[in-house]
């Protein structure tokens, strides 16, 4: 954003019983693609290295607030229950879920983030004028560096 390389960028995750998915989406021009992908990888690695206990505490608070506020909606409760059955094969009590969130440490998150940033399997999907885009191999090398 600071460099004006993209008009939108966001990340999202999906968790399942035996796998997970982290997606980073960025909308940019073909001319900015190579620089944007490199900076995105560097930022993922930096975020893992620079993570503070305060950031993890804020993330825990946000997760718990979203979870507890979601209990006010019957559709959100039903979606949560279905997701829990899909992932865990049961619906754990809300207190158990909150306790699990509270037990996550900065070290836990840092180790996970470092793995995602440096070595988790990756895929690359591009559309539009992408002739100047680096290949997946080049991006993997930058992640591993």
What residue ranges belong to the model's regions?
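C-terminal regions of mature proteins
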Residues: 46, 64-145
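M16/insulysin-pitrilysin zinc metalloprotease superfamily fold
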Residues: 2-70, 139-145
């Amino acid at each position: 954003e600071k460099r004006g390389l993209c008009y939108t960028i966001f990340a999202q995750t999906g968790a399942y019983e035996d796998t997970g998915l982290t997606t980073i989406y960025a909308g940019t021009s073909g001319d900015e693609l190579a620089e944007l992908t490199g900076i995105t990888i560097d930022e993922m690695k930096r975020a893992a290295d620079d993570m503070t206990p305060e950031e993890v505490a804020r993330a825990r608070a946000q997760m718990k607030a979203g979870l507890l506020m979601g209990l006010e909606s019957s559709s959100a409760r039903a979606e949560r229950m279905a997701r829990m059955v899909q992932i865990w094969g049961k619906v754990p009590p809300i207190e158990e879920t909150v306790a699990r969130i509270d037990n996550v440490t900065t070290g836990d998150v840092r180790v996970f983030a470092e793995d995602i940033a440096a070595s988790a399997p990756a895929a690359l999907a591009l559309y539009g004028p992408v002739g100047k885009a680096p290949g997946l191999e080049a991006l993997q090398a930058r992640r591993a560096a």
